[in-house]
UniProtKB/Swiss-Prot annotation:
Residues 770-960 form the TH1 domain. Phosphorylation of the TEDS site (Ser-356) is required for the polarization of the actin cytoskeleton. Phosphorylation probably activates the myosin-I ATPase activity. Residues 956-991, 1017-1180, 1227-1258 are annotated as: Disordered. Residues 1087-1121, 1142-1155 have a biased composition (Pro residues). The modification Phosphoserine is found at S356. It comes from the Eukaryota. Residues 1157-1219 form the SH3 domain. GO terms for cellular component: actin cortical patch; actin cytoskeleton; cell cortex of cell tip; cell tip; cytoplasm; mating projection tip; medial cortex; myosin I complex. This is Myosin-1. Belongs to the TRAFAC class myosin-kinesin ATPase superfamily. Myosin family. Residues 1240-1258 have a biased composition (Low complexity). The gene is MYO1.
Length: 1292
């Protein structure tokens, strides 16, 4: 990667100037040979294995540092590589991190430089496994900052010394030997080094997080207590030994129980001297040091207190001399100490009044726990006092403005037995992981904003859901459940643990949580961790019992009283903060602090468990690579721009790739450098999506693009050949796809449609025993099965299928409802999703978990276990499924496609019996048959039913022996086109339909809506007995019915919209005389209104404006009615043919201007009772309304003429009213007398007035006209292009 020089931060910068002194690249023979890649974002293949291989190669070469962008990866070498000397440190001063090899000094230099250059707070987050080198990295950063901010002032030097002295002091009190690390930090630490206006360290601040105080009283085998106990017991002076009774560590239970008092690589005596020196540098007085060691002695002697049983089985002190000496060290009364250890005081309350006080004796186990609690409390408070005392010393100088923070915190822990300490540690790591991703993206965005780069925010897994699972209060998280359990059973730890286990049942629906008897699992970002419930509530209390508090408050030692301040009002009813509350507060404060600083990151890796400088354990390192999420970090970095370079450097590197910039290896371009960059990118055919040009830099998105540029010189023509091959393959694939579509159409013509055949099979299964809904009999109704598209890759159905854990092929899927019964309550109809696979039937429910929608399987039914399905003989949609040998109640479900569901079940299991009768029988409880009755009720919703008290009330449906209607002929919509390459279909906008449709042509698209909704109008005149909703339209135009919610019949197949009137929509199949050709009748327009001029478009032109039709007498009020019209009775030849055979008639004389209302007035052509929604506007036939807005979905926003009410109505139910203009219009002389039809209609020039009058004279003329119209229609369809097959594929 080329070098990037720093520049002054500016929002905008002028374009790069012309550069003419570009030199040829030269080979640096003195550079160390690079092994692997120094930045993991340049790896060709991103996987955990490839990252591990690269780290191994560099480790074996002595290169322990690697970058991921600005993140540093450090592998512990377990040896001195000589890379931390002053000479090495000097080479990194003032150098960009890309100018020198990866190093922790480069991170420190970048932090210090950014602090000075941008005056922004800096921080470094160091994370990794225990023993991976986190503390060492923190030391090196402090070493570099102290050296880089050199000053000759004594006060500044003293602050530097104190900052460096915090390391040995806090290591002694906060680190211990573990199985994995001889100097493992057992607490989190955030050190802020604060700088004055001259960027010199003038102050500091240390924040402590979660000391592992449990280690004070017990360790596992071959581990040790905190270092200070061994340092003090081995190196204490004679004065301390005489005054405090200090013995060797083998004499104390707390330091010898684990069997490890000495470590080969640790010199406790030397470390003790370093600790004393650090205390002196920080400024601890001798008196303060004496008190610290006094309490350390007391803690060691407390561990030697043992108990034995008395005659009553209670605990008593085995050796009172030890308690006497402990009382001497703590300066408390010995009798009170003994009483506090073996007894517990309990006080009862009666409301707001105090009750009786009892002294309850403890057994040996309880007394031992009290003893350990006292020792842990003293050490924890002592450690916090030391941190506070260090902070007091570090605040010596004023004037601190900016800071550099160093976070050294424990890593993610997964042990065989994990308890409260591990969940706290892992919770903090979850918070750090969250801020790591957020701040990484933030820094990326800032650079893109500086260079004015457009980019899309990176999508990544946000572990906020896991953090909320642990820390949330509403709904309660795990810590909140712990607090509630403690409050419920405060005195009894076992009872509190049981209460906590019960509360964990609340989290079972969370996908990141699992409950396993006495354990629970949290799915952290770094892996699943199993936690033990036992003992968690007791550790969460983090509170001394009342007797110990009174004991410590009675001390005469002022220092002990200082570290145990008065707890306040003892009678307060407020719950004291628990350990969980403290860690949540500390973690959130840490996140706030880090969010206010510019972050840097160091991820440390431990190469082996043997601490050998030569071993590299691939399996162990691979585990850490996954644990630290390095692959995710690389992908986040690469999701933005993996490579960025200044224009000059980019041109210098790649000018050979453009013939306009080079000739025979020489740079020949004389223009602007930015133009040269554009030429290179253009001539190399780099997609514009793969790069962006900023103010001074070019950004390459992926490393593969960069590598392609590097290899383009040799492979340019190969790439061009590949593009030609790719285009040819695309052409061949298009031909194959076209052939497949033709073959599919031919197969359907020969063998029929399998979906329609399945529908017919389903109708036979019903056997005429059940009343049918009108929508079930439509010709376009076919059994497609997977209505939710569960088998597709990206769809809502696929999402539900994935969440439900279904891997099989889906045969049938639909949304519906299921009856949910509760004891003592009315049954509820809950929305459900039904999915049928070849082996199981799933009923899936959805719930909100942490404000996120999730799906879960409520029922999983083996298809082979279904004995029968039960239905009523009415038109309702309820189905009862009887399952044998089931421990759950049988499901009673409601779905519009019940017949199709039963058909698929019957196909999968032929033994299933279909019971149809007046009742539905199913098992409401296992082994208990329950019957649901059905009855006719005309007050039921038109499109649904009413379920109440085990009774289904529904309207009368179609007879069960009704035959299925024939499928209408399929044709392409006149305003629809299909893009061959993309398959995108443009259905057009309703406003455009008026401009492009021919006024004389009744398109077949008027006879049915979108096939997905299944609402069609039959072409068979004998099947049409009643009027249908008439869509509104302009003069001389026809509108296609809306695609969505055009009528109530459409809504019948939409489970989410139940608007409309079923009776009106179903009436469209009865009266043949009402609508002879199934086309929407056109409302007659007054002659005084001008005809809108259609927009020019290719293809046939619409005919001229027609004149008034002849008739017996003029109509006083021309109103649109669903009746037989003269216009619809006349055969209409094709517009092109008509243009060739006869000239158009002359237009009528221009009408005088007429007053027009401010908003169009429409009239209801049919009754629209609505579905009960407050957003709908129920109408009666003949009601007049204003229409303020029409939506493409098929709904119009209507308003009463007096403005008293407003709501939505189906556009197909209303027609534009002419009565509103009747008083404003003036009579206009027509060019021909009116006929006797009673309705004045406009003719678009396709037929003569005489032909129209003759057609209206007799009923036989109507039949002949209809036949001629159908014949003309069929003739036109034969001449249409082959694209009609595309629309046929979209039908039911």
């Amino acid at each position: 990667m080329a070098i990037i020089k720093r520049g002054v931060r500016q929002k905008t910068q002028p374009p790069a100037k012309r550069t003419t002194n570009i030199k040829k690249a030269t080979f640096d023979s003195g550079k160390k040979k690079e092994v692997g890649v120094s930045d993991l974002t340049l790896l060709s293949k991103i996987s955990d294995e490839h990252i591990n291989e690269n780290l191994k190669r560099r480790f074996e070469n002595g290169s322990i540092y690697t970058y991921i962008g600005h993140v540093l990866i450090s592998v512990n070498p377990f040896r001195d590589l000589g890379i931390y000397t002053d000479q090495v440190l000097e080479t990194y001063k003032g150098r960009n991190r890309l100018e020198v090899p990866p190093h922790v000094f480069a991170i420190a230099e970048a932090m210090y430089y950014n602090l000075k250059a941008y005056n922004e707070n800096q921080c470094v987050i160091i994370s990794g496994e225990s023993g991976a080198g986190k503390t060492e990295a923190a030391k090196r950063i402090m070493q570099y900052i102290a050296a880089a901010s050199s000053s000759h002032e004594a006060s500044i030097g003293r602050i530097k010394d104190m900052v460096l002295a915090t390391n040995p002091l806090l290591e002694s009190f906060g680190c211990a030997k573990t199985l994995r690390n001889n100097n493992s930090s057992r607490h989190g630490k955030y050190l802020e080094i604060r700088f004055n206006a001259q960027f010199e360290p003038c102050a500091g601040q240390i924040t402590n997080y979660l000391l592992e105080k449990q280690r004070v009283v017990g360790q596992i085998k071959n581990e040790r207590n905190f270092h200070i106990f061994y340092q003090f017991s081995k190196g204490a002076s004679d004065r301390y030994r005489k005054t405090y009774g200090v013995q060797l560590p083998e004499q104390y239970v707390y330091t010898s129980a684990s069997g490890c008092t000495s470590v080969d690589t640790i010199d406790d005596l030397n470390d003790y001297e370093a600790t004393l020196e650090a205390m002196n540098v920080i400024g601890l007085s001798q008196a303060e040091q004496d008190e610290i060691f006094r309490l350390l002695s007391a803690i060691l002697w407390i561990g030697n207190v043992t108990f034995m049983e008395d005659d009553e089985g209670n605990a008593k002190i085995a050796d009172t001399s030890i308690t006497d000496f402990v009382a001497y060290l703590l300066q408390v009364d010995a009798g009170l100490l003994v009483k506090s250890l073996v007894e517990r005081t309990i006080e009862t309350t009666h409301g707001m009044r105090r009750g009786s006080i009892y002294n309850v004796p403890l057994n040996i186990v309880q007394a031992t726990a009290v003893r350990d609690a006292l020792a842990k409390a003293i050490y924890n408070n002592l450690f916090e006092w030391i941190v506070d005392r260090v902070n007091v010393s570090l605040q010596a100088l004023p004037g601190a403005e900016k800071s550099i923070g160093i976070l050294d915190i424990y890593g993610f822990e997964i042990f065989e037995h994990n308890s409260f300490e591990q969940i706290c540690i892992n919770y903090v790591n979850e918070k750090l992981q969250q801020i790591f991703i957020q701040l990484t993206l933030k820094s990326e965005q800032e650079e893109y904003a500086k260079e004015q780069i457009q980019w899309t925010p990176i999508k990544y897994f946000d572990n906020k859901v896991v953090c909320e699972l642990i820390e949330a209060k509403r709904p309660p998280g795990i810590f909140a459940a712990l607090n509630d359990s403690v409050a419920t059973a405060h005195a009894d730890s076992n009872a509190a643990d049981q209460a906590f286990a019960q509360r964990l049942n609340l989290f079972t629906s969370n996908p990141h949580f699992e409950l396993r008897s006495s354990k629970f699992v949290i799915k952290h970002y770094a892996g699943d961790v199993t936690y033990d419930i036992g003992g968690m509530t007791d550790k969460n209390k983090d509170q001394l019992q009342r007797d110990l508090v009174e004991l410590l408050n009675s001390t005469s030692n002022t220092f002990l009283a200082t570290i145990f301040p008065d707890t306040g009002d003892k009678d307060s009813k407020r719950r004291p903060p628990t350990a969980g509350d403290k860690i949540i507060r500390s973690a959130n404060e840490l996140v706030d602090t880090l969010s206010k600083a510019q972050p840097s990151y160091i991820r440390t890796i431990k190469p082996n468990q043997t601490k050998s400088p030569l071993d590299y354990d691939d399996r162990q390192v691979l585990h850490q690579v996954k644990y630290l999420g390095l692959q995710e970090n690389v992908r986040i970095r690469r999701a933005g721009f993996a490579y960025r370079q200044t224009f000059e450097k980019f041109v210098e590197r790649f000018y050979l790739l453009s013939p306009q910039c080079s000739y025979a290896g020489d740079y020949t371009w004389q223009g602007n450098t930015l133009d040269a960059v554009n030429l290179i990118l253009r001539d190399t055919s780099i997609p514009v999506t793969e790069y962006q040009l900023g103010v001074t830099k070019v950004f390459i998105k992926t490393p593969e693009t960069l590598f392609a540029l590097e290899n383009m010189r040799d492979k340019y023509w190969h790439n061009m050949a590949s593009r030609i091959q790719r285009a040819w393959r695309r052409f061949l694939q298009r031909r194959i796809d076209s052939a497949i579509r033709i073959q599919r159409a031919i197969r359907e013509m020969k063998h029929g449609n399998q979906f329609e055949q399945l529908r017919d099979y389903g109708n036979k299964l019903l056997g005429g025993r059940k009343e049918r809904r009108a929508m079930s009999l439509l010709g376009y109704r076919a059994f497609l099965g997977d209505y939710l598209s569960c088998n597709e890759l990206k769809s809502k159905g696929a999402f539900v299928k994935r969440k439900a854990g279904i891997n099989d092929h889906v045969v049938f899927s639909i949304n519906g409802q299921a009856l949910h019964s509760k004891f003592g309550r009315s049954a509820q109809r809950l929305p459900k999703t039904f999915i049928l696979t070849p082996s199981h039937f799933y009923i899936i429910g959805k719930t909100l978990v942490n404000n996120q929608l999730t799906y879960a399987v409520d029922y999983k039914i083996d298809v082979r276990q279904i004995v029968y399905v039960s239905l009523t003989n009415l038109q309702d949609d309820w189905v009862g499924i009887f399952v044998s040998n089931s421990t759950q109640p049988d499901p009673l479900i409601n779905t519009y496609f019940k017949t199709e569901l039963i058909t698929h079940l019957k196909k999968l299991n032929n033994r299933i019996e279909i019971k149809i009768g007046p009742t539905i029988e199913y098992q409401k409880k296992p082994g208990k048959i329950h019957a649901v009755k059905s009855q006719i009720n005309e007050n039921a919703p038109p499109l649904g039913d009413i379920y109440k008290s085990s009774t289904i009330m529904v309207r009368r449906g179609r007879p069960g022996n009704c035959s299925q209607r024939k499928k209408p002929l399929s044709t392409r919509l006149p305003d629809t086109y299909t893009t061959r390459e993309t398959g995108y279909k443009n259905a057009g906008h309703p406003t455009n339909i008026r401009q492009v449709q021919e006024p004389t042509h009744i398109s077949h698209s008027q006879q049915h809506t979108s096939s997905n909704l299944g609402f069609v109008y039959s072409l068979n005149p004998s099947a049409v007995n009643h009027p249908r909703p008439v869509p509104s339209g302009s003069v001389g135009t026809t509108s296609t019915p809306p695609k969505q919610a055009a009528s109530a019949a459409q809504a019948a197949y939409n489970p989410h919209k139940l608007g409309g009137n079923m009776d009106n929509s179903s009436a469209a199949y009865g009266n043949a005389s009402a609508l002879p050709n199934s086309a929407p009748s056109q409302a007659p327009k007054p002659a005084s209104r001008p005809v809108p001029k259609p927009a020019p478009r290719p293809g046939p032109k619409p005919g001229p404006k027609p004149g008034p039709k002849p008739g017996p007498k003029p109509a006083p009020k021309p109103m649109p009615r669903p009746a037989k019209s003269v216009e619809n009775s006349v055969p209409r030849p094709n517009a092109i043919e008509q243009g060739k055979t006869a000239p158009p008639p002359p237009p009528p004389p221009p009408p005088p201007p007429a007053a027009v209302p401010s908003e169009p007035v429409y009239e209801a052509a049919f009754d629209f009772p609505g579905s009960g929604s407050p957003n709908e506007f129920p109408l009666k036939k003949g009601d007049r309304i204003y229409v303020t807005r029409q939506e493409p979905s098929g709904w119009s926003l209507a308003k009463a003429l007096d403005g008293s009410k407003e709501g939505w109505v189906p556009t197909a139910y209303i027609v534009e009213s002419k009565a509103a203009f009747s008083q404003l219009e003036q009579p206009v002389a027509s060019s021909a007398p009116l006929g006797n039809s009673g309705v004045a209609t406009r003719e678009a020039g396709t037929t003569s007035a005489a032909t129209a009058a003759a057609s209206a004279a007799t009923p036989t003329a109507f039949s002949a006209g209809l036949a001629d119209a159908l014949a003309a229609r069929a003739n036109k369809m034969r001449h249409e292009d082959s694209g009609s097959d595309d629309n046929a594929d979209d039908d039911w």
